[in-house]
UniProtKB/Swiss-Prot annotation:
Coiled coil: none
HAMAP family in the cross-refs: Ribosome_mat_RimM
Free-text function comment from the UniProt entry: An accessory protein needed during the final step in the assembly of 30S ribosomal subunit, possibly for assembly of the head region. Essential for efficient processing of 16S rRNA. May be needed both before and after RbfA during the maturation of 16S rRNA. It has affinity for free ribosomal 30S subunits but not for 70S ribosomes.
Family affiliation: Belongs to the RimM family.
Protein name: Ribosome maturation factor RimM
Organism: Sorangium cellulosum (strain So ce56) (Polyangium cellulosum (strain So ce56))
Gene label: rimM
One of the GO BP terms on file: rRNA processing
GO molecular function, one term: ribosome binding
Entry text on domains: The PRC barrel domain binds ribosomal protein uS19.
Length: 170
């Protein structure tokens, strides 16, 4: 089975002249890249290449990294705009009932009556709560608050989100 890679950061720009890269992390609280997992770089031209992080250091709201074989500013500049992806199996294990956003993307969203409402396009974090952005066939997307009032269960393994109600959503 092929490894599944999950985007965790973008290469914002080179840093200095020795090939260091400044990453814009999708989750600033995550320390996943500090553990130097294997990474896959998805380049702006659509190609991808595997890479190895050899050094990291947090700075401001970003992370500076050195990647094996990237030894000067020109080589670093060639990676500007690349997406940094990490194998899903490198993520920390979760407790019962917890899931990572990447694990529910594409999941079927079922109405309380058992009908298919749509599929999860993404998970957005807002100050008051997280919401599932649900893409519906032939209709506008909707945002479903990820609260017990609206979502009765999330089965990331089976890729099913069961809604408790449609009231206020459609």
């Amino acid at each position: 089975m092929e490894r599944r890679y999950v985007p965790v950061a973008d290469v914002a720009r080179p840093h200095g002249v020795q090939g260091e890269l400044r990453l814009r992390l999708y989750n600033e609280a995550s320390d996943l890249l500090l553990t130097r997992p294997p990474i896959r770089l998805r380049l702006p031209d659509g190609s991808a290449r595997d890479a190895k992080i050899v050094a990291t250091r947090p700075v401001d709201k970003a992370l500076l990294v050195r990647i094996a074989g990237i030894d000067d500013r020109d080589a670093a500049e060639a990676l500007r705009g690349a997406t940094v992806c990490v194998p899903r199996d490198a993520f920390a294990p979760l407790s019962e009932g917890e899931f990572y956003a990447c694990d529910v993307e594409g999941a079927r969203v079922m109405t309380p009556d058992g009908d298919l409402l749509g599929h999860v396009r993404s998970l957005q974090s807002y100050p008051t709560c997280d919401v599932l952005v649900v893409e519906r066939q032939g209709a506008d997307s909707i945002e479903v608050p990820l609260t017990e009032s609206f979502v009765s269960s999330v089965d990331a393994e089976r890729q099913v989100v069961q809604l408790a109600t449609l009231e206020g959503l459609v």
